[in-house]
């Protein structure tokens, strides 16, 4: 599967091995997790320069001018693009260590079932009320207001 995805142009990134919160984890935990990701996942998908922050949690918080030890360690491991979670287009180039900080949308089952505000964030791409199949997991419910015709 990985070979076919690569052949058809897919790019892989890391989301850490254990989905750890990078803003509250110790450097030692981040190092152990990163090693495990490189050994068990990176060895399959190949090198990547992209790290998608689990929970959207930046290791240096929201201060893009700060470059602490965890961020530096991750950069030393080859990561250059660091993507958090956000609803607007955001990017910052950190010229002191050659890194791009940006936000990304994360459409998933949770956002498909979110309230009107949440599904509004994705309305430029789709309307959750038109595409979600509620018969698959009927007991999960939704928080949005049904469409009126």
Where are the regions that the model predicts?
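Active-site beta->alpha N-cap acidic-glycine motif
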Residues: 1-8, 59
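A short helix-to-beta-strand connector/capping loop
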Residues: 7-10, 46
């Amino acid at each position: 599967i990985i070979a076919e995805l690569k052949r058809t142009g897919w790019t892989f990134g890391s989301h850490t091995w254990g989905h750890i919160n990078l803003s509250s984890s110790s450097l030692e935990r981040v190092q152990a997790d990163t090693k495990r990701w490189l050994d068990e996942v990176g060895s399959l998908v190949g090198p990547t320069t992209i790290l998608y922050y689990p929970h959207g949690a930046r290791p240096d918080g929201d201060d893009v001018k700060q470059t602490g030890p965890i961020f530096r360690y991750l950069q030393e491991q080859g990561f250059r693009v660091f993507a958090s979670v956000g609803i607007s287009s955001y990017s910052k180039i950190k010229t002191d260590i050659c890194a791009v900080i940006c936000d990304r949308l994360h459409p998933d089952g949770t956002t498909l079932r979110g309230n009107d505000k949440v599904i509004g964030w994705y309305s430029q791409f789709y309307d959750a009320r038109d595409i979600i199949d509620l018969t698959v997991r009927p007991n999960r419910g939704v928080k949005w207001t049904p469409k009126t015709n």
